[in-house]
Amino acid sequence: MTISVSRRAVLKGTGAGFAASLFMHRAPTLAAETQAHSGNSEWTGYTICDSCNHMPMCGITFHAKGNTVIRIENWKEHPNHFLCSKGIATLQRLYNPNRLLYPLKRTNPKGSDDPGWVRISWDEAIKMIAANLNAVKAKYGADRVLFYCGDPKEPRPPVMRLARYFESPNYGCESSVACNLAYVHAEELSYGQEIAGGPSPKTKCVMIVGKNGSWASPHGFFRNLLAQKARGIKLIVSDIRRTKVAELADIPLQPKPGTDGALAWGMIRVLVKEGLVNQSFIDQWCTGYEELVQYAEKFTPDYVEKETGVKAEDVIAAARMFADGPSAMMLPGQSIPHQHNGCNNVRAYSLLMALTGNVDNVGGSSFDDWPKDYIRWDEGYTRTFIDQQWFNQPEQKAKRIDREFAPIWNEMQVLCSPNALPEMVKAGRIKAFAGFGANLLIWPDPAEYQEAVRNLDFSFATDYFYRDETHHDMDLVLPAAMNYERYAPFGVHGRKVSARKPVKPLGECWEDWKIALTIGAAVTGDSDRFFGGDPVKACDSMLNDWGTSYAERQAMLPNVNVCEWFPAPQKEKFAKGLLRFDDKPGFRTPSGKIEFFSSIQAKHGQPGLPVYVEPPKPTKDYPLKLINGTRRPYITHSKTRGDQPYLLELEPESVINMHPKDAQDRGLKEGDRVWMISPYAATKVRARVRVTILCQPGMVDAQYGWRGDQETQVMIPRKNWDPISGYPCCNDVCIEVVKADEEKKSA
């Protein structure tokens, strides 16, 4: 099936009056100018959608006249070639009249109601950034500058390179704030690197934990899962919600919010007690088994049922089914890591793979078959490009602002956790902020972070739009080119590598790679190290080492071909010395083995086992558990709520899901307007209620990213950070929901 959408169709109904009624914050009038396009010849271009938090993801074929995109459709040769509503709406975003098209500088003091934005040239903006960053470096030290990437994730490699050669180890991103990296962190504590993955043709059973791929990844994940079910694979799903994925399960498990760790330990105990573990694998490749066996003893099926609400017989059946493998496991990127004990809860689930020997085996969960210099694209593409070795030096780790706040994260991760930014600004540890796609609403109690930015010596941000809640007290706001207007980055899809063929940016927008590289050349005086500000040359610095080039990949379009630098898949890489950097057999852990008992956690005064900690209990005044940040299939958090009216037509305001019993108890019906009340928020939070069995009784799920009086992040406390990851507790907050009048709320 081919999806094709024209510019005329997607912009229909989005005239000035309609758009003005939908956008929360209009950009300065400067941004309403448009760039004239020349030429009438029609041509075909290729790019990648950046609407999801998975990158690089789905391919887009577009047709343009001159420099105007007139129609988009599936890029059928691309590995991910189906577009969803978010991908289709990117064309509307491209020609949104509120786009930021020129660099803006504040002229009024910070804290003023009107920042006094004026248009300036790129030359002035770059000189201003270089002068201010170098002034902070000279007076306080390079580590007093925080470099940060939010969304899109695409500019992370050059921004990290910028931080490196500016000599600041304080580089963070939204994944080190509150996204998916905590689950990777949990796996690394036991396995040394990320492992959990989806089913393969030889998989007999797969366990999916807290992952609603039917909405988060409908075309890739869910289509593959349906195909696997059709061939007869057994499916275990552990999810607090009754999702479409859970509906497919042979054994659906629905624990109470925050009790996943108890469920995982209950399954571990069944494996041990019934002799379902792979003892030979454990003896050769694992450590800490005796401690695990001893701790698991208390998690009897009856105890687990009482604690989690999952029937004892289902706990036993799930453990037996998983043991009858080969089995794979898919762990959550978003949900469980945001519990109060999230990292340990993920770790407990992950140990099921090692206990049954389903580690990098045929049909089991696998490590990626990447060359050792390659890292997850959003951490820099290659260790060489970002000079990862420098970031990992002890003297650089000691300068990071997360050293005391999240010491385990500090030791394990190359990305800094910036969650203690308000405290670090007050203490003088951070004096300047360089933000690429930054969104201050990502944090709990965002007002604390807005105040922190206000008190900095200097700050700037790049973005597609002017966003007042983030940019109001910045010194500069820079216009970023969108996905149709960018060359970088190239895409890595398994062993395949894709290039792009873009249009020219509107106005004076620059792609983020060009911005970061140009700033790097300006602050260091070394243009060559930053490729003269050229994104394609930066890409070629990696692609040439891989035996290819950007031009070569462009010449292959529309085809996306294998890059031979990426090796063919192998199994049991741990036994062949293909994982460790010293080329010895084993894993990238301190012991060289899978660690049931984490030596790193113990080193920092935490239990070495992923112990279970009971979640906060609901109270009489706050009897409902809030799950904040759930997905919808047509919107990704805050990314598309004010920029693409087409998507707002699908859901124009915040909607919370509530079980019929809870709705009945409160006299609520479908579509009622409600207020959410939290002990941590000074104001109520507005929403509409959806009555559904998607939620179990006693919980409410809400979406993160709405603005104004729909902003859910104000209900999340800036305390109870996960001690293992430093992540906020977004999914264990107790609230109440009450019916609201249609009047304006009172604080």
Identify what each model region corresponds to.
Residues 278-279, 315, 329-330, 358-368, ...:
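Acidic/polar loop patches that form or flank catalytic/metal-binding clefts of enzymes
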Residues 157-238, 261-265, 351-473, 481-489, ...:
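Extended redox/cofactor-interaction regions of prokaryotic respiratory oxidoreductases
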Residues 106-122, 276-311, 503-585, 650, ...:
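N-terminal leader/propeptide and maturation segments of large enzyme subunits in energy/redox metabolism
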Residues 2-276, 298, 311-312, 519, ...:
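N-terminal export/assembly segments and adjacent metallocofactor-ligating motifs
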Residues 243-248, 295-300, 326-332, 429-430, ...:
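Short acidic (Asp/Glu) and glycine-rich catalytic loops that position anionic groups and cofactors
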Residues 250-254, 479, 495-506:
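Short beta-alpha connecting loops at secondary-structure transitions
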